[in-house]
Amino acid sequence: MSRFQNKIVLITGASAGIGEATAYAFAREGARLFLVARRREQGEAVAQRIRDAGGTAVFHPADMSQRDQIGAMVASCVAHYGGLDVAFNNAGIDGAFNVDTPDHPEEAWDQLLAVNLTGVWFCMRHQIPAMLATGGGSIVNMASMAGVKGFPGSSGYAASKFGVVGITKAAALEYADRGIRVNAVCPAVIRSDMADRVFGTDERSKEEEAGSWHPMNRIGEPDEVADVVLWLASDQASFVTAETIKIDGGLGA
C-alpha cells in the first residue's frame, strides 16, 4: 500500500529518533521527502539512505529557533518539488528537567519556547499558505504527554508543549473548511536521544525507570509514533482534525 505516492512531505527534526523513523516510513509509501534538521551530516545521511533504497529525498539544514530559516525552508521545499502536501513539525528540544519552577533557568525557558512552540507556529505560518496554493494538505505537530498532563520539574517543556496543543487546535479550526487538517501527536517516553539524556544510556536501568511510567511497562519505539503520524497525514484520517493523539502505553488514562 502506497498512501503517499508522489506526495510532498516535509519533516523537521529528521536526522534522528522519531523524525528519522517517520522519514523512512513515508519513503516506503512513495513520498517525496524534504528533510530538515540542524545536524547536516546526520540529516544528509538519512536522505542518502532513502535514496539508496530507491526513494526520493533531499536534505535542507535549518534551525527552528531562527525564523528566517523557517521561511526559507518552506520556500525551498516548494521551489524544489512544486508544492507541499504534508508537514510533520517534529523538531524539538528537552531543555531543563527535574527543576522546580522558581529555579528554571530563564535561558532554557526562552530556548524551549523559541524552538518547541514559536518554531512550530512559524512553520505553520509558512506551510499553510503553501498548502492552500495547491488545494490543501495535512499538518502533524509534535506535542508530548507533557502537553496534556502535568509533570513536576518540567515547567518550561510543559509550557512549550501545552502551547503546541493549543495552536494545533486553533489552526485546525481556522482551516477545517479549506482543505487543511492539523493534528498533534503526544508521545510518552520513546526510545531516542532525548530519553537517553533524561534517563541515561544504560538500557536496563532506562527500561526499568522509564518503562515503569507506563502501564504497558516498557518504553515506546520511534516506529510506533511514525505509524500514528502517517495515519493522521493520510486520507484514512480524512475526517480527523484538531486532535491530539496520545502514544503513551496507557500513561494518560
Model-derived features: positions:
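Alpha-helical segment proximal to the catalytic Tyr-Lys
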Residues: 129, 173-177, 238
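Catalytic Tyr-X3-Lys loop
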Residues: 102-122, 136, 140, 164
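Active-site helix of classical SDR
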Residues: 124, 160, 168
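Residue(s) in the substrate-gating loop at a strand-loop-helix junction
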Residues: 144
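Conserved glycine-rich Rossmann-like NAD(P)H-binding loop of the short-chain dehydrogenase/reductase
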Residues: 29-45
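C-terminal helical subdomain
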Residues: 184-187, 207-236, 240, 247-249
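Substrate-binding pocket helix/loop in short-chain dehydrogenase/reductase
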Residues: 70, 97-101, 105-113, 206, ...
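Conserved glycine-rich cofactor-binding loop
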Residues: 8, 15-17, 39
